[in-house]
A protein has these predicted regions:
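N-terminal cationic amphipathic segment used for targeting or macromolecule association
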Residues: 6, 18, 39-42, 51, ...
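Amphipathic alpha-helical interaction elements
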Residues: 13, 29, 33, 46-49, ...
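Alpha-solenoid helical repeat scaffolds
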Residues: 7, 23, 36, 40, ...
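Amphipathic alpha-helical scaffolding segments comprising HEAT/armadillo-like alpha-solenoid repeats
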Residues: 17-29, 50-62, 85-96
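Core register positions within helices of long alpha-helical scaffolds
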Residues: 11-14, 44, 73, 77-80, ...
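Short, solvent-exposed mixed-charge patches
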Residues: 100-101
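Eukaryotic tandem repeat interaction scaffolds
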Residues: 1-15, 19, 23-24
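Alpha-helix N-cap/helix-start positions at coil->helix boundaries
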Residues: 2-3, 18, 33-36, 51, ...
Length: 101
């Protein structure tokens, strides 16, 4: 069943439907869920690049006791969302890109 759930959450990202963001966040935050499923949800959030995922991704990364696949995927997704939103802001104003990554 784990493979089916991984496929389901990653497919939500590929469908590019931002209505899935709240559900993906809940899966990712669920400590009782398999870590590979949670990592799949984190990856899908990175594909969707929705700002609503930034805080939950940040919390997962900061509260991690160790850096495994879940945390690594969350960090990559966080960076993707930050980069996408930074590029969108560039058109609105001229600012220097932060160097915190």
């Amino acid at each position: 069943w784990v493979n089916v759930r991984i496929y389901a959450v990653t497919s939500l990202g590929k469908l590019n439907n931002k209505k899935a963001v709240p559900a993906l966040i809940e899966v990712m935050k669920n400590d009782k869920e398999n870590d590979l499923v949670r990592a799949g949800a984190a990856a899908a959030l990175g594909v969707l690049r929705d700002q609503r995922a930034l805080l939950p991704l940040r919390e997962l990364i900061i509260n991690a006791e160790e850096l495994g696949e879940l945390e690594d995927t969350a960090l990559k997704s966080f960076k993707k969302i930050m980069a996408a939103n930074w590029e969108a802001m560039q058109g609105a104003q001229t600012v220097k890109k932060p160097s915190f990554f």
